[in-house]
Amino acid sequence: MPMPREIGQRLRELRGATPRENVAKACNISVSALSMYENGSRIPRDEIKIRIANYYKLSVQCIFFMNQWHV
């Protein structure tokens, strides 16, 4: 399982140039929560992982559990 910082890096790569506010609103989470996930200081609850995965049209496993990452 990847470390929180690796997951955060994945989330930042997925977001790209999209404003953090847009992703947070679409996932129904706060901007500060998304920032903490992207910085690796927090791991989202399972419910939030599903929302994030659905937003990016990827599986929860792909984003949060795979050791290898390719965008």
Task: Give a label for each model feature.
Residues C62-V71:
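Short amphipathic recognition helices of helix-turn-helix/homeodomain-type DNA-binding modules
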